[in-house]
Amino acid sequence: MRLNTLAPAAGSKHAPKRVGRGIGSGLGKTGGRGHKGQKSRSGGKVRPGFEGGQMPLKQRLPKFGFTSRKSLVSAEVRLGELAKVSGDVVDLNSLKAANIITKNIEFVKVVLSGEINKVVTVKGLRVTKGAKAAIEAAGGKIEE
């Protein structure tokens, strides 16, 4: 037995129907497309969302909301993630160095989620009341 002699068992595979190859095939002449009309032509599709000329649902519904530009440069950091920072000072640059936030982030808020056992000094970041209490309870401090 060689790789070039391998073949599926006889009768295990069915050849696909070949469209438009004579009336005896069952899919000759119109090839299963019926007669006339847009869908019988080549390239005869309608774009996604087209409803036959009726005002589409996407256009019938009102627009709402917007994307805040500040949210693109803001991030929340959990207390548990502060342990990943090497050193005892946590600021914007140290968070970026530890890959906790991306390089485009300009504003960070530390939130109470998870536990902190490490003594850290948080510099120049906003901190929630609960997170502040947890950091101070662990022996850390917050500097503006």
From Swiss-Prot:
Keywords assigned by UniProt, alphabetized: Ribonucleoprotein, Ribosomal protein, RNA-binding, rRNA-binding
Name the domain of life: Bacteria
Disordered: annotated segments = 1-57
Q: Name one GO biological process term.
A: translation
Q: What GO CC terms are in its UniProt record?
A: cytosolic large ribosomal subunit
Task: Give the range the annotation lists for the signal sequence.
Answer: none
A GO molecular function held by the record: rRNA binding
Q: Which Pfam families match?
A: Ribosomal_L27A
Biased composition, class Basic residues, residue ranges: 32-44
Quote the InterPro entries the UniProt record gives: Ribosomal_uL15, Ribosomal_uL15/eL18, Ribosomal_uL15/eL18_sf, Ribosomal_uL15_bac-type, Ribosomal_uL15_CS
Q: Quote the biased-composition stretches of kind Gly residues, using this chain's numbering.
A: 21-31
Q: What does this protein do?
A: Binds to the 23S rRNA.
Summary of subunit composition and partner proteins: Part of the 50S ribosomal subunit.
The family line of this record is: Belongs to the universal ribosomal protein uL15 family.
Q: What is this protein called?
A: Large ribosomal subunit protein uL15
The species this protein was found in: Vibrio campbellii (strain ATCC BAA-1116)
Encoded by which gene? Answer: rplO
